């Protein structure tokens, strides 16, 4: 209380006292300066005559008299050049004023103020008449110094008086405050104690009257508050008791609900397990008859058929393949939903992946007269790591949808770099079409399961509606995102943004081609296709010159002929609507007469049509959209053809493998047996696991093909029994390969854990059977196609070097696609052979296996059974560190040479 009273009063007194003291000091200082100016002004006329006469005695007397005035410290009279004529008082301590002229100058220091005033002839009028000629003549200077000491002393006295008054007032205020605090502190202490007791829960506490009206009102308010709190507490306690009773009654209900929730959770888990098991069983049940349908369809296609029957079989095969793709989509979706889809992380080439995808889908686009274009920006890293199979699946889905929903125009696939670090690359891959477009409502429902933009009964494009959902889930699992920008009636652009780690650049993949510095004329009427083609040719080292029609191109080549700027190549992108094969053949003849090599790019659907226009189909005719690697190889061959080497090698194996086939389904068993026997294998077929175990114990086999799901003893149990029997006799393990229709990852892992060495997923093709036999036995099977004879009636022993029928079958009956796949393989053979040679010279087994495995993968999609078998055998022996590895590698080298030679002959 005392502090609250004294502190504001003290602050106010200090502020007012300080303010008035400062005002008084300022006033005294101002008066002092004015007195100094007045004294200086008065001295000027008094000393004017003396200064004019240079009368030092008179000037000294005036100066001495001036010192008698208050606060005057020193006086000086100066000549015109400021030489001292007379001085009185101590030495001046203030700095001399700076300046000149007719005005009074002053300079203020800490203890004194110094004045300097010029004296002119006009100031003599006080003692003598004014002489006009001397009115403006400078007679001298009056210098005066005024001391601040007197002023400061008066200021200190005023300050002391102010402080004395302030202290007196504060003492009086403190006395009053003490008396008032004594009358307030007692009641306040009582209030404080009462509030403290209320805080501690003593709500019965009440305050008595405190002696004043205000305090009594405060006490009354506190008492009412205490009574209210007491009543509220009693009501709260009653509520708590009631709530406790309610909780006690509800505990049993909550416990029952928890039990029900636990049961529901177990039921949900069981339902999920049953769903997964159902999908696996359905996969088996559907794939098993599909295996028979596809297998026997292939067998029927080898027999003598009428054209109509062959078409019927093609329809059956296509329908079965479509059904299989639908099943695969549903199973992929189920695996993603269950979180069981595992992504690979292997190196791949982005440009090859994108262009290969477009190559596979080109026939469908060209059948609708659509233009397919791939643009890979040059700053985009090509060597990346990830899951190329799943990325290809996503791109295939996006491009397929674009083809499906585009009636005319262009489909452009772009790959560009968004951001880059030393280790990673942020990519944006987009597929843009000129199709029907999507509304905002369609876009919102686009990435939902079993949903399509048009779900009406009259919709034309088909599908399960799972493709985009699977793509979205895959991209999200890769850590990226997928989206679409679309305008109804104008088209759509589906894009994916994905961050992938960079891979080591494979220097061996770069082709050493003699194209650097050559000039190429380019003709392509489609703007984007022309831009993509220009980039590809420039990446090959060519200098490009673009022409807008074939006549201008021919004129340009003619004009440049026999000049330093001659054009070496002409790359023509044409369609049957733009030029006929006969007319094109004439232009090619004219260009070749000008020493200009010609390459023709045409749609896959018109490949057979334009074969008549070129001399060398292999090097001169390529399908749109052109693949960079394939284009490089073809251009290199066109500029510098290689010598043909046709070494004929020995057969790859000396005896037929002996295979045990086990399956409870007679149709599947007959199919596998027939396929193997047609390829030259000795087959023993049994139904059931018990029969398989007995057969292994009684006969010797090179390989066992074991069905997994069989009654009685299934494939796993039979494998475990065989392994136990082998362990008892210390025998080497017989290779056992599972034939399964299950596609779940955990199913495949459990098969390998049960003792099986490998697995094949139904439906099974001849190629898969031949590969697995070669992989686990080292014995190559004969190609099942009918034997052919060349012009010399040479009979092929073992697998054929080049089997067009098999290539056509692997390409789903599409001749153009089969030719493109074969051309892609042939384009990479030189680089693969050189890489294998370098790896053998360096004894780098890892690089050797990697390169052969890559070549082996490429042969799986082409009708080159002999090279495929050689790759399989070499890879198997290398992995097993077998003694016949060098022989297998030599056979592989000869197989490559034979394939190149036969390709040249067939072309």
Curated annotation (Swiss-Prot):
Q: How is it modified after translation?
A: Activation requires a sequential transfer of a phosphate group from a His in the primary transmitter domain, to an Asp in the receiver domain and to a His in the secondary transmitter domain.
**Which taxonomic lineage is given here?**
Bacteria, Pseudomonadati, Pseudomonadota, Gammaproteobacteria, Pseudomonadales
| Gene that encodes it | gacS
The record ties this protein, via InterPro entries, to: CheY-like_superfamily, HAMP_dom, HATPase_C_sf, His_kinase_dom, HisK_dim/P_dom, HisK_dim/P_sf, Histidine_kinase_BarA_N, HPT_dom_sf
Where's it mainly located? Answer: membrane
- Cellular component per GO, a single term: plasma membrane
Name used for this protein in its record = Sensor protein GacS
Start and end residues of each HAMP domain = 182-234
Where is this chain's protein located in or outside the cell?
Answer: Cell inner membrane
Q: Where 4-aspartylphosphate occurs along the chain?
A: 707
All residue ranges annotated as the HPt domain in the record = 814-907
Q: One matching Pfam family, short form?
A: Hpt
The reply to whether Transmembrane figures as a keyword in the UniProt entry is yes
Question: Where do the Histidine kinase domain residues begin and end?
Answer: 281-502
TM spans, by residue? 9-25, 84-101, 159-178
Entry-annotated residues carrying Phosphohistidine: 284, 853
This enzyme catalyses:
ATP + protein L-histidine = ADP + protein N-phospho-L-histidine
Q: What class of enzyme is it?
A: transferase
Give the Response regulatory domain ranges.
658-777
């Amino acid at each position: 209380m005392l502090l609250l009273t004294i502190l504001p009063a003290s602050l106010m007194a200090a502020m007012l006292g300080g303010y008035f003291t400062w005002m008084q000091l300022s006033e005294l200082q101002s008066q002092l300066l004015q007195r100094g100016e007045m004294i200086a002004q008065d001295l000027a006329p008094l000393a004017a005559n003396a200064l004019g006469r240079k009368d030092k005695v008179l000037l000294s007397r005036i100066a001495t008299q001036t010192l008698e005035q208050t606060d005057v410290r020193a006086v000086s009279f100066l000549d015109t050049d400021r030489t001292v004529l007379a001085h009185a008082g101590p030495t001046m301590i203030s700095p001399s004023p700076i300046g000149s002229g007719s005005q009074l100058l002053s300079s203020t220091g800490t203890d004194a103020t110094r004045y300097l005033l010029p004296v002119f002839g006009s100031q003599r009028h006080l003692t003598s008449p004014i002489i006009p000629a001397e009115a403006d003549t400078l007679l001298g200077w009056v210098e005066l110094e005024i001391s601040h000491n007197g002023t400061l002393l008066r200021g200190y006295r005023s300050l002391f008086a102010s402080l004395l008054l302030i202290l007196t007032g504060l003492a009086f205020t403190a006395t009053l405050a003490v008396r008032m605090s004594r009358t307030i502190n007692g009641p306040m202490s009582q209030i404080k104690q009462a509030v403290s007791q209320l805080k501690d829960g003593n709500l019965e506490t009440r305050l008595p009257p405190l002696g004043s009206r205000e305090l009594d009102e405060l006490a009354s308010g506190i008492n009412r508050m205490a009574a209210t709190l007491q009543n509220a507490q009693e009501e709260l306690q009653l509520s708590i008791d009631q709530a406790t009773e309610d909780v006690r009654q509800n505990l049993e209900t909550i416990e029952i609900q928890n039990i029900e929730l636990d049961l529901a959770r177990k039921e949900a888990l069981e339902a999920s397990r049953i769903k997964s098991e159902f999908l696996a069983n359905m996969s088996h049940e559907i794939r098993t008859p599909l295996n028979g349908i596809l297998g026997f369809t292939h067998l029927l296609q080898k027999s003598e058929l009428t054209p109509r029957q062959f078409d019927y079989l093609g329809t059956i095969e296509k329908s079965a393949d479509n059904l299989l793709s639908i099943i695969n989509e549903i199973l992929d979706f189920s695996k993603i939903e269950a979180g069981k889809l595992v992504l690979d992380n292997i190196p791949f080439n982005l440009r090859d992946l994108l262009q290969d995808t477009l190559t596979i889908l080109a026939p469908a686009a060209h059948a609708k007269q659509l233009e397919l274009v791939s643009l890979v920006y040059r700053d985009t890293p090509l060597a990346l790591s990830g899951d190329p199979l799943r990325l290809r699946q996503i791109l295939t889905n996006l491009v397929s949808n674009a083809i499906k929903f585009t009636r005319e125009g262009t489909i452009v696939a772009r790959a560009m770099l968004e951001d880059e670090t030393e280790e990673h690359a942020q990519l944006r891959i987009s597929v843009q079409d000129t199709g029907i477009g999507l509304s905002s409502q369609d876009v919102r429902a686009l990435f939902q399961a079993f949903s399509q933009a048009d779900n009406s009964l009259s919709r034309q494009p088909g599908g399960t509606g799972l493709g985009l959902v699977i793509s979205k889930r895959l991209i999200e699992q890769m850590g990226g995102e997928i989206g679409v920008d679309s305008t109804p009636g104008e088209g759509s652009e589906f894009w994916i943004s994905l961050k992938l780690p960079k891979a080591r650049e494979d220097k061996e993949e770069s082709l050493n081609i003699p194209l650097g510095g050559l000039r190429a004329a380019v003709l392509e009427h489609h703007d984007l296709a022309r831009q993509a083609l220009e980039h590809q040719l420039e990446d090959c080292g060519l200098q490009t010159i673009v022409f807008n029609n074939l006549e201008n191109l021919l004129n340009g080549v003619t004009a440049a002929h026999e000049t330093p700027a001659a054009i070496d190549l002409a790359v023509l992108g044409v369609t049957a609507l733009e030029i006929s094969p006969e007319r094109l053949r004439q232009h090619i003849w004219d260009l070749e007469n000008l020493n200009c090599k010609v390459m023709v790019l045409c749609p896959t659907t018109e490949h057979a049509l334009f074969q008549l226009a070129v001399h060398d189909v292999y090097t001169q005719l390529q399908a749109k959209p052109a693949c960079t690697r394939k284009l490089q190889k073809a251009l290199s061959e066109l500029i510098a053809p290689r010598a043909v080497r046709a070494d004929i090698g020995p057969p790859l194996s000396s005896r037929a493998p002996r295979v045990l086939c086990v399956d409870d389904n007679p149709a599947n068993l007959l199919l596998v047996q027939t396929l193997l026997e047609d390829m030259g294998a000795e087959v023993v077929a049994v139904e059931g696991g018990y029969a398989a175990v007995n057969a292994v114990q009684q006969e010797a086999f090179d390989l066992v093909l074991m069905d997994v799901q069989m009654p009685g003893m299934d494939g796993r149990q039979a494998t475990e029994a065989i392994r136990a029997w082998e362990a008892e006799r210390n025998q080497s393990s017989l290779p056992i390969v599972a034939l399964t229709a299950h596609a779940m990852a955990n199913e495949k892992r459990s098969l390998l854990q049960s003792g099986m060495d490998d697995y094949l997923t139904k439906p099974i093709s001849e190629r898969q059977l031949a590969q697995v036999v070669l992989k686990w036995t080292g014995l190559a099977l004969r190609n099942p196609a009918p034997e052919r004879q060349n012009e010399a009636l040479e009979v092929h022993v073992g697998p054929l070097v080049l089997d067009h029928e098999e290539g056509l079958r692997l390409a789903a009956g599409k001749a153009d696609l089969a030719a493109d796949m074969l051309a892609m393989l042939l384009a990479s053979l030189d680089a693969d052979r050189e890489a294998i040679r370098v790896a053998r010279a360096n004894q780098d087994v890892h690089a050797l296996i990697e390169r052969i495995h890559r070549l082996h993968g490429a042969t799986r999609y082409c009708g080159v059974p002999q090279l495929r078998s050689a790759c399989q055998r070499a890879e198997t022996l290398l992995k097993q560190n077998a003694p016949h590895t060098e022989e297998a590698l030599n056979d592989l080298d000869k197989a490559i040479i034979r394939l190149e030679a036969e390709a040249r002959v067939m072309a």
